[in-house]
Amino acid sequence: MTAVADAPQADIEGVASPQAVVVGVMAGEGVQIGVLLDANAPVSVMTDPLLKVVNSRLRELGEAPLEATGRGRWALCLVDGAPLRATQSLTEQDVYDGDRLWIRFIADTERRSQVIEHISTAVASDLSKRFARIDPIVAVQVGASMVATGVVLATGVLGWWRWHHNTWLTTIYTAVIGVLVLAVAMLLLMRAKTDADRRVADIMLMSAIMPVTVAAAAAPPGPVGSPQAVLGFGVLTVAAALALRFTGRRLGIYTTIVIIGALTMLAALARMVAATSAVTLLSSLLLICVVAYHAAPALSRRLAGIRLPVFPSATSRWVFEARPDLPTTVVVSGGSAPVLEGPSSVRDVLLQAERARSFLSGLLTGLGVMVVVCMTSLCDPHTGQRWLPLILAGFTSGFLLLRGRSYVDRWQSITLAGTAVIIAAAVCVRYALELSSPLAVSIVAAILVLLPAAGMAAAAHVPHTIYSPLFRKFVEWIEYLCLMPIFPLALWLMNVYAAIRYR
């Protein structure tokens, strides 16, 4: 008979493993945060909650929170950058109290590609790589553009109705539309915090100007004429000037609107008060635009707030004294310390220069629109002296084309050159439409083809050629020769010489 007895076992002293460890987590720019972590839980379980705690602590300290860059994962690492195993605990990886860890983002080294199973999937995949999708910002801008387009179309329909019917319907409807859109634009401007929000508000604000203008123009009773034009373009000018003053954005667009509205309002006012003829009004506007072309750079500088410094004397008496162009007195509110204005900083000068460029671009665009309208209206093929406006249009186009070379900004040079070409094209098209003869159509078609071809040849040759100072001076003289006959020809067209002769 066999007996089985259990062998006596020696007492084994149990070793207690720690339940939590206090470690220092390094994050941000030299920031160390002490945290209490579970010593026996897998590292992967604690990574995401630890990231939230670290980011909240960084925000409290005024530091930038940790953000992921691309595709990858967050990991706890040792001081040397070696990541801890996500499936093991801190105890299993010999991490104890007082150790330092580093939480960082590890980029994914694997490259994932989409499986293409059909040609439609390949087309969609290729298009998604080449073109950006519509995001919420673009969607809002598209919606605002659609609303602005609808407002403009509705205003145009109501204006057409007022042109044919002397009723108050246009005034009431456009006033209601203008007030509603203007209120929405003001609300968006007050709540705007980003450039995208301000862009949407600017779209709504510019669309609100048109119904307000049509409402003011349609208010005077009677057939549409100069009184309606005076009131409408006056409101348009004031509205654009207020938007320019209080928003400080879209300087070029608002400046163009102000120039066109102000000049048209003056012409309509002269027509209403003095019953001035159309030829006299258009010729006077042309001369005003020519003078404004000369004054545009100085006017844009003043609008931008740029003060020209005073040239110092030969004795340098202003080197250690206050510059005389700076103010010596200042007005402040009660309780505040007076601070005299000093020389502008580099940032202020750059900002003022950019504003001056925008103002100048708006001035050139507005003047170009007015010159094109005036010259096209003056060149009437059914008048007795139809050769005189044609000569005037030729000299005006030559002056503008050569004046464009004096501007540094290429868009401003293109504006002047484009204005000169559009004048010639518009006059030719009017002659072809009104004469309606085979000879006129043939000549106009030849001019419309040969003129851009000559411009393209000049554009391909002139920038690659270095000209002598004498040749440049000769081109400048040609510009002056084109400028000089404009005023005598315009006065001749207005019959000023005949009035002086037979007075």
UniProtKB/Swiss-Prot annotation:
Gene that encodes it: eccD5
Family from the record: Belongs to the EccD/Snm4 family.
Record protein name field: ESX-5 secretion system protein EccD5
Lineage: Bacteria, Bacillati, Actinomycetota, Actinomycetes, Mycobacteriales
Transmembrane segments: 137-157, 169-189, 200-220, 224-244, 250-270, 272-292, 359-379, 382-402, 413-433, 439-459, 480-500
NCBIfam families: T7SS_EccD
Topology term for the membrane: Multi-pass membrane protein
Main location: membrane
Disrupted gene: phenotype observed: Mutants are defective in the secretion of EsxN, PPE41 and PE_PGRS proteins. Mutant is highly sensitive to detergents and hydrophilic antibiotics such as ampicillin, vancomycin and bacitracin. Virulence is attenuated both in macrophages and in the severe combined immune-deficient mouse infection model.
